[in-house]
């Protein structure tokens, strides 16, 4: 029989092993033959009188008394070792000891034969295959048995006999298991064979796909079968429990003697039943473990050994306890049953835990496939049923039939070669793949945005027009369209679901005439439908009620726009706390906070719910209460107000805390009360004398119904406010939160210049709500002159407001606003207007030149500028014009700061301001008569003609002294002298100055003074007519400029500051206390505010506009004037500034000796240190700290450079001194030769003249004594000063001749020279920051461009060069593209003219 069975089924077994169906496939193929064989053997045993096997469920009850001997203790020990024998790690377990009886031998032979039929070796691939042991057959057959047990009429004794026979069979049967150690290798061999036998590569690929597909599908089906087995196990446990209870009831009904006789039998039956259950549980656990091991083998993870054999599970101990209690009383059966139930649950829990661990392990190949098919992962311990199993099976079939399996298999093949590393589908490429279309994205956010294209979700909503967008970036781009009309409305970047649109109405819908601005969604409460104006007034004071027991409306309703504006007007006069959403309203946050605090102070009424039970009901209620028509709402509001007033007059009595009124009635009264209370005057002022002022109609009520409420209602309100049972602070808030009603216009009392109400609110929202005191707040009255009290904001422009009144509503085709376009009246613009009149266009936003359709009027206006070349937006700093306002804003980033806080460079002669130091240098050369590299027109074009308006406090210091860099200092007046400028505090004020590039990052923290102070100071510096000591200095302006340029700050090409002589960055002070001058008084004040206001006296201008060397060394071209030094007592005690100037005005013979005095003076000036507390004490704390940090950083970088500079300066001085001595010796030698020639001639002519000539020559050879330092004698001009002739090269622009050139060769092609010198030069970087500007950086304004061509075009904006000329109209353009756009206008005009001529000819 074995050979026939093996021969018949060997081919089927080999095929199923190849395709991975190792266990369940064999079971399916061998299940029916094995059952038939077992039934035959059972019938034979029944005829022989032996114990029937498990399948003989209908055996007679007498079989229980058949000669089946009881098992010996040896057999019990073998039963205890049974888990070891059936372990999956043993290929051939030990064979149990055979029974002594013939029946036991027959059962054993039967088991051996059945086992032998189930175990086969794969001769093709020599792999050990784990077959289904007889235990698993018993599990399946027992399931069939138990399924029929409720309907079976077999007595309990029969079942006991069957169970006993079954236990003997399993106890004596050797169980043989064959582990699936290398199933994956077997599949790999099949794949190798398929590849080797394949005809082409495509066939091999198709075979591999089919193999993988079958393997994954079978794996999922095996997992589903495992679920089914678990469900069957739970059903068996329930049936066994019911059977135990049934047996207990029948045993209790029997007599006591019979109970004693059958006690051992019942105990034995129960013991055998538990043993049977134990075997079934072991089979299930073995199945789970085999599945887990197969899973681990596929994953390449070494499988852990089986648990310790010495460990005995709880059910084994329970079995021994039942055996020991077999001789005891019959009452032990109940305890054994309970222990059995507990053991079943525990063993079932162990199997479930193993299954969960198997499910949680990562699968490298097809893990997501199983998870996508089995989508419902319920908790297994939950009670299940057959219906749930059918539902799960149907779900699996439906999911597998939808193509998801094939799609995921394609993904698996993409990662099939990466399955060994354990990553697989967790890689980023697969992680961000769209399940709809298969696209792969680089991040999760990009995938989410893409999924919105499939779902149609647009979560970002524009709070102005209501348009929706999929991303926040698209919303930002769209919101720029509203920036011009709504500059103060912030963008709402929070995603708003579409079902919440009713709570977030757009601003344009609120302003449209169809819906009143005061209309808003009604709060979802159990109130009757209130009016819209009542709702707008309800939120600020809804938190108070007439009784503390009623909290009123909870603060969950979002206030509409109109309410926020009202709150801003009210709270602006009381508190200054900012609001998070409307920072322009300083009092809005305080008002809302006060309202919130009041709502929190009120006790909570728990007797009744104040809102709907679910969000859907809330939305339904709100949708039901939304106003349909404004006229209907007005009528309802009027009726509601009158009814509320009548009820209030009838019921508004003193309300003690004990009285309980319906909450609906209280809420209606509250709504009416909140409409009334108005003025924040003391409560006593309105209690008796002016009751009518306590209640004012609302905005909407005053618009349509001028009549006021009855006086009885006002009296009631006054009495209520003054009642002792009501809290006073509640009345105060009720009256104080309504002040804004006096300052808001209504639709009826809008001024005549405002015909459209929505434009009025758009113009004034939300910045210009000014706060007024209570004394000037007029009381609202129905009179028509109420609009006269509407406050005007400081930024309100009546002309602009009137123009805005004619602007059409959004989405309208009204073109009347085009009359107010600010366009220069050029010929091209007029031609375009004529073309627009003559040409028929189909779309109002269509271009008449190129027929392009734009999105809006503003886009069309900007598009026309591309044709006309107009640039209406001009930068006031550099004079550059732009076509759009956005480009101008982007350009302002080049200047680093806002125009009002800009620190300009000013000419000390004519006070003209320039934004760039290079242009100021060229401008100064115009005053000194030196040649310039820029033309006067170019210099004039770069001039800042319109200085920015003053927005700083007028009492502050000079802006150029406050915003200066920390290198310089500003000397103040002496002990009794006046300060240096009008409007400026006196004293040794250490202001600082910096160039454009160095102080750009610091100007945001600086406070600048009034621009007029700058002009006053500059004029005082130049009003030197009353100073007799300054006469010689005015005659030497050239010498003054030359000296300034000689002592300027040297900067290396790398951007590192290189300072002359012993100059240090922090020691550039001109404090009179550190100069050592005789006029510097040590008692000079040290604070800017320590001196009185200066007066205009001639003494204050007694000094020259000469700055110290330290001041001139702050920047290359920083010539901003400072405050004047203290007045000098006499010419003998002249300051070092005068002595430095006097060097160049002395004869050459005295220059050498004077240089010896000047060098120590310069060193004294440059070595004087600036105290940190004095140098920057005038600056704000944040700027002071920043300057100190910059100062320390600069000191560390300049440590090595200063030493090298000192050595270089010393070497330079020695060279200058040697050159001066050499020139002096040459001069003496030439004079000696001339004297000798004259002497020889005189000897020949007159002998008497020889002695006189010799005496004269002797006088010439004798050296002259050195002059005093205080002398100011002026001699004839001699050779140039060697200090000037041997100056070192300038470091800011190495190729640019900053100083006057010696020859005229450098003056050719001035524009080319400045372009060549500026572009490759290193930028001006006094802070020695890291280089951030490349070779495409403009050397004038330091703006970086992407390429050299863009930089070349940019330089034309500075030079005003327009090389591209139009041949028709001779108009110049900076770029060729602009010229092409301009030529389109001529082409269209010529085409129309030719068409007109052709028509005329015809």
Swiss-Prot record:
UniProt feature, compositional bias: Polar residues: 1020-1029
GO CC entries: nucleus
Region (Disordered): 32-103, 244-271, 489-547, 593-651, 974-1038, 1058-1137, 1205-1289
Annotated compartments: Nucleus
Function field: Required for the establishment of the posterior-most head and the anterior-most tail segments of the embryo. Probably function as a transcriptional regulator. Could repress the transcription of the tsh gene.
PANTHER family, sorted: HOMEOTIC PROTEIN SPALT-MAJOR (PTHR23233:SF87), SAL-LIKE PROTEIN (PTHR23233)
Keyword vocabulary terms for this entry: Developmental protein, DNA-binding, Metal-binding, Nucleus, Repeat, Transcription, Transcription regulation, Zinc, Zinc-finger
Superkingdom of the organism of origin: Eukaryota
UniProt biased composition (Gly residues): 974-989
InterPro entries assigned to the protein according to its UniProt record, in alphabetical order: Sal_C2H2-zinc-finger, Znf_C2H2_sf, Znf_C2H2_type
Entry's family note: Belongs to the sal C2H2-type zinc-finger protein family.
Protein name according to UniProt: Homeotic protein spalt-major
Composition bias type Basic and acidic residues, residue spans: 32-42, 594-608, 631-650, 1223-1233
